Swiss-Prot record:
The modification 5-glutamyl polyglutamate is found at residue 438. Tubulin is the major constituent of microtubules, a cylinder consisting of laterally associated linear protofilaments composed of alpha- and beta-tubulin heterodimers. Microtubules grow by the addition of GTP-tubulin dimers to the microtubule end, where a stabilizing cap forms. Below the cap, tubulin dimers are in GDP-bound state, owing to GTPase activity of alpha-tubulin. The keyword Transferase does not apply. Dimer of alpha and beta chains. A typical microtubule is a hollow water-filled tube with an outer diameter of 25 nm and an inner diameter of 15 nM. Alpha-beta heterodimers associate head-to-tail to form protofilaments running lengthwise along the microtubule wall with the beta-tubulin subunit facing the microtubule plus end conferring a structural polarity. Microtubules usually have 13 protofilaments but different protofilament numbers can be found in some organisms and specialized cells. Some glutamate residues at the C-terminus are polyglycylated, resulting in polyglycine chains on the gamma-carboxyl group. Glycylation is mainly limited to tubulin incorporated into axonemes (cilia and flagella) whereas glutamylation is prevalent in neuronal cells, centrioles, axonemes, and the mitotic spindle. Both modifications can coexist on the same protein on adjacent residues, and lowering polyglycylation levels increases polyglutamylation, and reciprocally. The precise function of polyglycylation is still unclear. Keywords: Cytoplasm, Cytoskeleton, GTP-binding, Isopeptide bond, Magnesium, Metal-binding, Microtubule, Nucleotide-binding. InterPro entries: Beta-tubulin_BS, Beta_tubulin, Tub_FtsZ_C, Tubulin, Tubulin/FtsZ-like_C, Tubulin/FtsZ_2-layer-sand-dom, Tubulin/FtsZ_GTPase_sf, Tubulin_C. GO terms for molecular function: GTP binding; GTPase activity; metal ion binding; structural constituent of cytoskeleton. This is Tubulin beta-1 chain. Residues 425-445 are annotated as: Disordered. Pfam families: Tubulin, Tubulin_C. The MREI motif is common among all beta-tubulin isoforms and may be critical for tubulin autoregulation. Residues 429-445 have a biased composition (Acidic residues).
Amino acid sequence: MREIVHLQAGQCGNQIGAKFWEVISDEHGIDPTGTYHGDSDLQLDRINVYYNEASGGKYVPRAVLVDLEPGTMDSVRSGAFGQVFRPDNFVFGQSGAGNNWAKGHYTEGAELVDSVLDVVRKEAESCDCLQGFQLTHSLGGGTGSGMGTLLISKIREEYPDRIMNTFSVVPSPKVSDTVVEPYNATLSVHQLVENTDETYCIDNEALYDICFRTLKLTTPSYGDLNHLVSATMSGVTTCLRFPGQLNADLRKLAVNMVPFPRLHFFMPGFAPLTSRGSQQYRSLTVPELTQQMFDGKNMMAACDPRHGRYLTVAAIFRGRMSMKEVDEQMLNVQNKNSSYFVEWIPNNVKTAVCDIPPRGLKMAATFIGNSTAIQELFKRISEQFTAMFRRKAFLHWYTGEGMDEMEFTEAESNMNDLVSEYQQYQDATAEEEGEFEEEGEEELA
């Protein structure tokens, strides 16, 4: 089977990673001891992708848990599914990264990285045919962003032909822990552009807005935000975990979704949006699901898709529904909104259907969009970065760990280049290339 090795780094990465394992263990009928209690062969059909079958028929997540301080790991270990993980796969330091990217990437993190790679190697060796890696982390802190990107580049060195996929939580002033988040995020994006194949941008700004506006939670907690993240992660990995044809592995997903290597930052979406612990009383129809998942308010990145154009889209419907109706609705969306899809990639919307819905819902839909509107997110970070960097505010924390100002300048311009590239393809039309030839032909006539 085609296995995926999961890594989670830093406080945020470990918290959303732990939620992810709770949700998918539940979907696959695996209890906190790793024992299967399911009721459908579909649950076990591709269980090997994320789980290793250990002695005694126990299923153990192919997960490596990393942090530079022991706190979060302890709470994962004592949490609901803490005992399902392999004890040797917890790798942690004591010093912490203090929300400093340089500590995670160059000093503290660099000291721990080899012991993490040993565990990664061991996990990779127990795979039949490893398809790739996925990392959950945030870009605003020190460990997830600094050490997370260090791990990515080290793994890339050792496994250059495997797919590298990240779930990256993008910082926002609305849900802020630290004033230096724009620095950490920009330095991280600088790495992600070069070293990952697919990055799901999970934007705290959007999560907060969804909780506040749609779910009417006046003071959203991290638990509320993480509920949305785990629903999204469960949705986008559905095709990898259950039998099906479309985007059934990370590479096929990348081939469908990434038209240019640097433009691999996806905007995830989910429908229906429900708050934690609530059940859905009315089952949604396929047209409602389709309409909701293309709605900007359902996007997990705070970008308005109507401000850009889709290069590519993948949609995953879950639950018992008519394939014919799904296809009709998806075509309907494209025909009505054709100006929001680039015309120079025909058939750029792909749809998959999985019979098993998420817990508590009869039907759900997950959206993965590669939209040029994602530039809004990078612009937002870039503006905050520039405001501080212009005055060299807080820089001494980074240069003190041996970093050079030059690296900041490079990261800044790499991110600005990324924004321009998205803009360039947003403005591109199918005709542009042909204009010159036509002129030549006219003269001949």
